[in-house]
Protein backbone atom coordinates (compact mmCIF):
# COMPACT_ATOMS: atom_id res chain seq x y z
CA UNK A 1 0.00 0.00 0.00
CA UNK A 2 1.45 3.32 -1.07
CA UNK A 3 1.48 5.89 1.72
CA UNK A 4 3.10 9.23 2.49
CA UNK A 5 6.88 8.87 2.60
CA UNK A 6 6.98 5.65 0.52
CA UNK A 7 9.67 5.24 -2.14
CA UNK A 8 7.91 4.35 -5.40
CA UNK A 9 8.87 3.39 -8.97
CA UNK A 10 6.93 5.05 -11.81
CA UNK A 11 5.19 2.78 -14.38
CA UNK A 12 3.64 5.46 -16.65
CA UNK A 13 5.57 5.11 -19.98
CA UNK A 14 4.95 8.67 -21.19
CA UNK A 15 6.27 10.19 -17.96
CA UNK A 16 9.66 11.93 -17.86
CA UNK A 17 10.37 9.91 -14.69
CA UNK A 18 9.39 6.49 -16.16
CA UNK A 19 11.16 3.72 -14.14
CA UNK A 20 12.68 6.33 -11.77
CA UNK A 21 12.29 6.39 -8.00
CA UNK A 22 10.42 9.12 -6.17
CA UNK A 23 8.96 9.81 -2.74
CA UNK A 24 5.23 10.11 -2.11
CA UNK A 25 4.54 13.65 -0.85
CA UNK A 26 0.78 13.30 -0.32
CA UNK A 27 -2.30 11.28 -1.28
CA UNK A 28 -5.63 12.99 -2.02
CA UNK A 29 -8.69 11.08 -0.75
CA UNK A 30 -11.33 13.09 -2.68
CA UNK A 31 -11.64 10.65 -5.61
CA UNK A 32 -9.65 12.48 -8.30
CA UNK A 33 -8.04 10.53 -11.16
CA UNK A 34 -4.40 11.14 -10.16
CA UNK A 35 -4.42 11.41 -6.34
CA UNK A 36 -0.78 10.62 -5.51
CA UNK A 37 1.77 13.46 -5.59
CA UNK A 38 5.32 12.15 -6.05
CA UNK A 39 8.47 14.23 -5.52
CA UNK A 40 11.71 13.43 -7.39
CA UNK A 41 15.40 14.30 -6.97
CA UNK A 42 15.89 15.41 -10.58
CA UNK A 43 13.86 18.05 -12.41
CA UNK A 44 12.23 17.70 -15.84
CA UNK A 45 12.70 20.04 -18.82
CA UNK A 46 10.43 22.67 -17.22
CA UNK A 47 12.28 22.66 -13.89
CA UNK A 48 9.53 20.76 -12.05
CA UNK A 49 10.28 17.93 -9.61
CA UNK A 50 6.73 16.78 -8.65
CA UNK A 51 3.91 15.09 -10.55
CA UNK A 52 0.53 13.45 -9.87
CA UNK A 53 0.04 9.74 -10.55
CA UNK A 54 -2.71 7.14 -10.17
CA UNK A 55 -2.23 4.33 -7.63
CA UNK A 56 -1.88 1.71 -10.40
CA UNK A 57 0.99 3.67 -12.03
CA UNK A 58 3.19 3.22 -8.95
CA UNK A 59 5.02 0.32 -7.35
CA UNK A 60 6.15 0.70 -3.75
CA UNK A 61 9.86 -0.08 -3.45
CA UNK A 62 10.37 0.90 0.19
CA UNK A 63 7.91 1.65 2.98
CA UNK A 64 8.35 4.87 4.95
CA UNK A 65 10.66 4.68 7.92
CA UNK A 66 8.94 4.40 11.30
CA UNK A 67 9.21 7.39 13.60
CA UNK A 68 10.88 6.76 16.97
CA UNK A 69 8.47 6.43 19.89
CA UNK A 70 8.12 9.44 22.17
CA UNK A 71 9.34 9.03 25.72
From Swiss-Prot:
What is the stated purpose of this protein? Stabilizes the interaction between PsaC and the PSI core, assists the docking of the ferredoxin to PSI and interacts with ferredoxin-NADP oxidoreductase.
The record's family statement is: Belongs to the PsaE family.
Organism of this sequence = Nostoc punctiforme (strain ATCC 29133 / PCC 73102)
HAMAP family named in the record: PSI_PsaE
Q: Which gene encodes it?
A: psaE
Record keyword Membrane present: yes
> Where is the protein situated, by its record's location annotation?
Cellular thylakoid membrane
Q: Which keywords accompany this UniProt record?
A: Membrane, Photosynthesis, Photosystem I, Thylakoid
GO biological-process terms attached to the record: photosynthesis
Cellular component terms per the entry's GO annotation: photosystem I reaction center; plasma membrane-derived thylakoid membrane
* Protein name, entry field: Photosystem I reaction center subunit IV
How is the protein disposed in the membrane? Peripheral membrane protein
Query: Is Thylakoid among the key words of this record?
Result: yes
